Amino acid sequence: MHGADSIKACIGPLTSSPKLLELFMKVMSDAEVWRYDPFTERSMWNPALFQKKKLRVGYYADDGYVTPHPPVIRAVNEYLDKIKKLSFKHVEIELVPFTPYDPSGAVHIISSLYFPDGGKELKEELSSVGESLTEMSKMALNNPSVQRFNIEELWKAHTQRDTFRWNLMHEWTKAGIDMLITPVLPGAAFKFGTCNYWGYTAYWNLADYTSVSVPYSSVKASDKPVEDFKPRNKLDAEWQALYSPETYEGAPLSIQLIAPRMQDEVVVEALKLFSDIN
């Protein structure tokens, strides 16, 4: 929607290898697109951002709000174990547990800022061409955080967004990490119309941080549900109820690498560094 920049969107490349991703980023940087697009920030590609003798890598498999399905936790832990076992030239890797700042609050803020008009324009555009809302769009619009803001309410929501960013930066700096490893979703590739939580990526959209996702592993028959699962909240219970290894066996899983804003080089170089993990 034109003019709706409470949460800015960008187009991310989809490539078949870390080297092709790096090539794309270099080409876009060398093209100096900021000379032609007033909404693009000046940023020269600088791999030196990654040139450290020691890299502190934060991680979490669970955001503390919605519990991932068992194969996701297994995949993240496997990925971390392989990092520990690999020998890297010229760099020492230190893995550091990280607790994300206020994930439930982040989901509330970004859910409201996706549709600051309460979804009015989206519904009107779909109606004008005879299209109906998909199940995923219905879930997003029916979120209790979605409302039509007046200008004072929008300013307040922007202040909440900015306060979240300040507090997250404080936690990140206090942890002393260079980058972070997390799940992309708290589940595998999902059945159409069933995904009701995307906070593991939306969190970083709200933060305006850089991330790259990489496929890793898939659901196995041995990834059994947690017995006597005790949900933290209603959403946690609903999410966990979606899972069974019979339904998801073979479905792909993904890991994401995250770095602060304008540090794309860090995640691309890390992806290259970890490219032997499979």
Segments from the language model and where they lie:
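Serine-dependent amide/ester hydrolase catalytic core
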Residues: 61-68, 120-231
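Flexible, acidic loop-helix segments that line cofactor/substrate-binding pockets
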Residues: 41, 61, 98-113, 136-148
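Short glycine/threonine-rich loop-to-helix capping motif typified by GTGT followed
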Residues: 72, 106-117, 190-196
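General small-molecule cofactor/ligand-binding pocket signal
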Residues: 89-99
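Preference for well-ordered, secondary-structure-rich cores of eukaryotic proteins
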Residues: 26, 52-57, 108-118, 126, ...
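Aldehyde/semialdehyde dehydrogenase
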Residues: 67-81
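Amphipathic alpha-helical segments in well-structured domains
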Residues: 73-77, 115, 119, 197-201, ...
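Structural helix-boundary/capping segments
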Residues: 1-60, 77, 82-84, 145-148, ...
